[in-house]
């Protein structure tokens, strides 16, 4: 598997570790052909993820069926392995547009700066900072709080707070990899390099703790993250559902 491929699978694994199969907002489906299991689909709230099992591939017939499954279920976003980007984007283009993103891996210098970082912040304090930055979070406080606290309690996620103005959340911690998710700074403190400092601190701290630290960002942010100490290691595509006006 490529790193992007393993990221999709790891996130599916973290969903399963957090919730299992007993909740109606998380579903798993097997991808099969001629009785052989090729991969797995997960649907968590409105997000779908598709991954292959090790040494398995999707042929054009299976990709056509996956496209039909996507169009039938109409998730808000679909993530999958980069090698299938062009084909699935073409097959679903009537209702989805492809959004490229770059995957980064942190390259540590083994030098943790002396920042006063709260590693166990109150999640309400984290939400207060993220809400102005991410409308989807702002509009779903209870859902965000329930999911984040559930994962934190199980050691699958962690939030960090720098002062009372910048935060970052680890979206998952599984199989020795920590994926950095939402990073935000309150509007009046932006432009002061707080997020940059916090991300560097997190990268060094988690590397020291034995984790690989990764994150995803839009391609135009490559230079920003490289300056912090992240190195681009892949590009993939996320399908975003086209909102009909």
Residue ranges and their predicted role:
Residues 199, 219-224:
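Short glycine/proline-centered loop/turn elements that form peptide/ligand docking sites
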Residues 44-116, 235-242:
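Acyl-donor-binding surface of acyltransferase catalytic domains
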Residues 13-74, 164-181, 186-187:
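Conserved donor-binding loop and adjoining core beta-sheet/short helix segment
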Residues 58-68, 185, 191-205, 227:
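Conserved acetyl-CoA-binding loop-helix of GNAT-fold acetyltransferases
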Residues 112-177:
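Flexible, substrate/cofactor-facing loop regions flanked by secondary structure
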Residues 73-82, 206-218:
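Conserved GNAT acetyl-CoA-binding A-motif
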Residues 88-92, 224-226, 230:
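Conserved active-site tyrosine of GNAT-family acetyltransferases
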Residues 2-9:
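Short, small-residue-biased leader/transition segments that mark boundaries at the very start
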């Amino acid at each position: 598997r490529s790193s992007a491929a393993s990221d999709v699978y790891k996130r599916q694994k973290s969903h399963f570790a957090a919730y299992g199969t007993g909740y109606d907002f998380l579903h798993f489906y097997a991808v099969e052909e001629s009785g052989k299991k090729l991969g797995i689909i997960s649907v968590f709230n409105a997000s779908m993820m598709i991954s292959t099992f090790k040494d398995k591939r999707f042929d054009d017939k299976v990709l056509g069926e996956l496209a039909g499954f996507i169009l039938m279920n109409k998730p808000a976003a679909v993530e999958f392995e980069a090698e299938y980007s062009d084909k699935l984007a073409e097959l679903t283009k009537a209702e989805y547009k492809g959004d490229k993103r770059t995957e980064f891996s942190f390259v540590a210098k083994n030098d943790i700066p002396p920042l006063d970082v709260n590693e166990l912040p109150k999640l309400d304090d984290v939400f207060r900072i993220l809400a102005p930055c991410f409308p989807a979070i702002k509009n779903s406080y209870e859902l965000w709080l329930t999911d984040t606290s559930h994962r934190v309690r199980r050691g699958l996620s962690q939030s960090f707070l720098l002062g009372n103005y910048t935060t970052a959340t680890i979206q998952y911690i599984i199989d020795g990899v920590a994926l950095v998710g939402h990073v935000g700074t309150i509007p009046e403190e932006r432009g002061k390099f707080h997020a940059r400092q916090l991300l560097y601190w997190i990268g060094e701290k988690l590397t020291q703790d034995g984790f690989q630290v990764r994150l995803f960002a839009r391609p135009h942010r490559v230079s920003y993250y490289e300056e912090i100490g992240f190195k681009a290691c892949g590009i993939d595509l996320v399908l975003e559902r086209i909102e009909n006006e």
